[in-house]
Amino acid sequence: MSEITIRPVLTKADRKAFVDLPFRLYAHNPNWVPPLKDEVHGLITPGKNPWFEHGEAEFFLAERGGQIVGRISAHIDHLALKQPPEQGMGPGCGNWGMFEAEDAAVAAALIARAEDALRAKGMTRSMGPISLAMWDEPGLLVEGFDHPPVVMMGFNSSAYAPWVEAAGYAGVQDLLTYDLPIDKGLPEL
């Protein structure tokens, strides 16, 4: 198997590859709901996303054999650094997110690169996956892969949780969504 190279997103072509990767990875998954590409471009562009007024981010691509096989962000929300640690973030806590990987080796390399980037910025803890803003798409889908995601909830491969756990991460909080068929009226309370 070819060597995995992790490189920063620097050019317009890199940004396009970063945005386009999930479209290839989930092309045959009927439950994946693709985002609007222009919206994702806006999220990762400092002049278009107000999050960058209080945050900073680096974006990385994983490449193997000339093909993009993964992506990740390493980011710091300076407002979150001011929060008490018992609220989940706090001083020294950086984040990684926008995570996609073809396999476990790519996942491990990407997470390690994001952690290195956060350490280089003085962070002493890492939490992820979290999109740039904590309230966009936090965490991993760990069950319900047979349903499309609801608004503001991410979608990922069922392989991701074991890969993230292999990197030393553990779940912090469960976020739940519920589905109720209402075609026959609402149930009695």
Model-derived features: positions:
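Short amphipathic alpha-helix that is part of the acyltransferase structural core
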Residues: S2-G47, G92, L175
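Acyltransferase donor/substrate-recognition loop-hinge adjacent to the catalytic core
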Residues: E3-I4, G154-L189
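Membrane-embedded alpha-helical bundles of multi-pass transporters/translocases
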Residues: P22, E53-A57, R71
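Short low-complexity, flexible loop/linker segments enriched in glycine and/or proline
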Residues: L43, L141-G144, P187-E188
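A short helix-loop-beta-strand connector motif used in the catalytic cores of GNAT acetyltransferases and
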Residues: T45-L61
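Conserved beta-strand in the GNAT
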Residues: L61, Q67-D77
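Feature marks short, surface-exposed loop/turn motifs that line or immediately flank catalytic pockets
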Residues: H78, L132-D136, K184
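Acyl-donor binding region in acyl/amide transferases
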Residues: Q83-Y169
